[in-house]
Design a protein with these regions (language model features):
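C-terminal catalytic and target-recognition region of SAM-dependent MTase-like enzymes
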Residues: 46, 73, 87-149
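Short, contiguous acidic/charged loop-to-helix segments that flank catalytic cores in large enzymes
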Residues: 20, 61-69, 93-98
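Mobile active-site "lid"/loop adjacent to the S-adenosyl-L-methionine
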Residues: 47-77
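A structural alpha-helix within SAM-dependent methyltransferase catalytic domains
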Residues: 41, 72-79, 107
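Flexible loop/turn segments at secondary-structure boundaries
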Residues: 9-10, 36-37, 58-60, 96-99, ...
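Conserved SAM-binding motif I beta-strand of class I
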Residues: 1-4
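S-adenosyl-L-methionine
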Residues: 8-51
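Helix-to-beta-strand junctions that scaffold the AdoMet/dcAdoMet cofactor pocket
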Residues: 22, 82-84
Length: 149
């Protein structure tokens, strides 16, 4: 199940599923992921893998706390849906949340969700998105896979 708040993004996902011949096993909905994840938690749903790719949540330092709250909340909700021993795949695409802070946010979410986590892999962007050390906003992608107990 793929969720996105953007109808255009969902339409593109549907078209890609059709192009790849997987439209019978891939389903997409226009929805607010925060609301859906919360509802699924209330329903007691659990999954082997939950993948989160939220928006940046902030584009300025003035609203960095909003981003921290957003990342923590969506990851907390995602962790609650992961079966014991399953995996949470998550990411962040803002340079204002550096890799160290992103990992701290994930740790805070795990604590609040009362789940133990084991890092499987943590990466930043690939070579086609170069990090230019003298330009602060070029290191922005973070990708994490954790096993959730």
């Amino acid at each position: 199940m793929g969720l996105d708040i953007s109808a255009n993004a969902v339409q593109q996902a549907i078209q890609n599923a059709e192009l790849n011949g997987v439209q019978n096993i891939c389903h997409f909905e226009v929805a607010n992921a925060f609301d859906v994840l919360k509802q699924w938690g209330k329903e007691g749903r659990h999954y082997d893998v939950v993948m989160l790719d939220p928006p940046a949540f902030t584009k300025s330092r003035e609203t960095i706390q909003k981003a921290i709250t957003g990342y923590k909340e969506i990851n907390l909700r995602g962790m609650k849906l992961v079966k014991q021993g399953g995996f949470l795949v998550t990411s962040s695409c803002t340079n204002l949340v550096n890799p160290e802070l992103f990992l701290q946010i994930i740790d805070m979410a795990a604590k609040d969700a009362r789940r133990k986590i084991r890092q499987v892999i943590f990466q930043t962007q690939s070579a086609d998105h170069p990090v230019i050390r003298s330009i602060e906003n070029t290191q922005y992608l973070k990708f994490l896979i954790i096993q959730v107990q």
